[in-house]
Design a protein with these regions (language model features):
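A polyanion-binding, active-site-adjacent surface
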Residues: 2-221
Length: 221
């Protein structure tokens, strides 16, 4: 595995596979977050998945496991995907930032939101994942993911439920991060927000199906 000092600069070696990309990500020292994290957490899923989900960053459990969305937020995501009839095995899941940013509170490691510099420094890895997977639709889970993908700060409520287009033409949607649902105390509000989250995932599947049908029609014509 490359030493961290090898990847402090902006030059990234040629990468041919997701497994190779994961190793290079784990050697990343492009921002200081690697110093306090256990490891980088690369994306995971089908190499040519049609749907990519992008979260903010790994949480405590993800940092320890080295896999994305395996903690409480991941459980919410799995349930929502199932209700939207989207097999997680058919999806590529990743994060805008690959290292866990946190602060110590006693013996606990509490999440801290990545800043603009950290998001930008980590963007190269997300772009390489997108280049390799080539998803037809990308769903940004939360404001950090949306900022990384769109290149600007966004307000989720203003963009939610709308089909967007990234600079390369890829279809994109913006929704909440599943961890947001874990923080809602009011039961009625939590139920409503969860239903909307599932609806957002269903919309992504609908866009996928519609675009695939349109492409098939063009081939026949």
């Amino acid at each position: 595995m490359p030493e961290k000092t090898q990847l402090e600069l902006d030059v990234v070696p040629a990468i041919k596979s997701l497994a190779e990309l994961a190793k290079v990500e784990n050697a990343c020292a492009r921002c200081p977050l690697y110093k306090d994290a256990t490891q980088a957490v690369p994306g995971e899923g089908r190499r040519h998945a049609h749907l990519m989900l992008v979260g903010e960053q790994p949480g405590d459990k993800e940092d320890l496991a080295g896999k994305p969305f395996v903690g409480p937020a991941g459980q919410v995501l799995d349930r929502a995907l199932a209700e939207a009839e989207i097999p997680r095995t058919e999806v590529f899941v990743t994060n805008a930032v690959k290292h866990f940013k946190h602060e110590m509170r006693g013996k606990r490691r509490l999440h801290k939101r990545p800043n603009a510099y950290e998001i930008e420094r980590c963007k190269i890895w997300l772009e390489l994942e997108r280049e390799m997977v080539k998803p037809a639709v990308i769903v940004a889970l939360g404001a950090t993911a949306a900022r990384s993908l769109l290149g600007r700060p966004v307000t989720i409520t203003k963009l939610r439920g709308r089909r967007l287009e990234l600079s390369d033409g890829t279809a994109a949607l913006v929704t909440i991060h599943p961890s947001f649902l874990l923080r809602i105390r009011d039961a009625a509000d939590k139920k409503r927000q969860y239903a909307q989250f599932v609806a957002d995932l269903r919309l992504a599947a609908k866009i996928l199906a519609k675009d695939a049908a349109r492409a098939a029609t063009r081939r026949v014509a």
